[in-house]
Amino acid sequence: MKTYRRQLREKIIQALYTLELRDVDTDSAANWLLTKEIMDDPNAMKFFNHLMQSIVRNREEIDRYIAKHTFNWDMSRIAIIDKNILRMALAEILYCEDIPPKVSINEAIEIAKKFSSTDKSSKFVNGILDAIFNDMKAEGRIKKCGRGLVDHSEQKMQKTENNR
C-alpha cells in the first residue's frame, strides 16, 4: 500500500501541473484534487500546505538549483511533470526538516516512474536530485532534525573508516 505521504506528494504534483496549465490559484488547484478524507485530516493538510507553499514561495531559488544542474537543458525544455517533481523534492529537502533527504529523493523517483511520459524520467530525476543534494550538503544548506537527519549510514561508514 502507498504511504499516506506518497498520496499527498502525488496530489501536490497534480496541483503544480494544474497551476502550470490553468490560470488558477493554489487553493483552487488543491480543492479540485484533495479528497474529503485528506481535507478532514489536520496532519495531512499541514504537510500538504507546508510543502505546497514552500514550493510556491521559493520557486525561483529552487529553479536556480535545477537550472545549475541541467547544463544542456533549458528549463522550458524539461517536461512539466519532471520539473515539478524536482521542485517538490527540493522543497522537501530544503524546507521539511523532519524528512530525510534520501526519502525525498526516493519518493521523487517513484513518482516520476508513475507520472512521467518516458522511462528515462526517473533516471533523469534521480541524477539531477543526487547532484543537487551533494552540492547542498557541501554548501551546508541541508538543515535537518529528528528523523530527518542527514543519512546516518554515511556517518557510520566514516567512523568505520576512521577506526581502521
From Swiss-Prot:
Checking Gene3D superfamilies in the record gives: NusB-like
From the Swiss-Prot or TrEMBL record, what is one GO molecular function term? Answer: RNA binding
Q: Which GO terms describe its cellular component?
A: cytosol
Keywords from the UniProt entry: RNA-binding, Transcription, Transcription antitermination, Transcription regulation
Q: Hey, what's the signal peptide range on this chain?
A: none
Q: Name one GO biological process term.
A: transcription antitermination
Q: Per the record's keyword annotation, is Manganese included, yes or no?
A: no
- All disulfide bonds of the chain are none
One short Pfam name that applies is: NusB
What family is this protein classified in?
Belongs to the NusB family.
Q: What does this protein do?
A: Involved in transcription antitermination. Required for transcription of ribosomal RNA (rRNA) genes. Binds specifically to the boxA antiterminator sequence of the ribosomal RNA (rrn) operons.
Name-wise, this protein is Transcription antitermination protein NusB
Phylogenetic placement of the source organism = Bacteria, Pseudomonadati, Chlorobiota, Chlorobiia, Chlorobiales
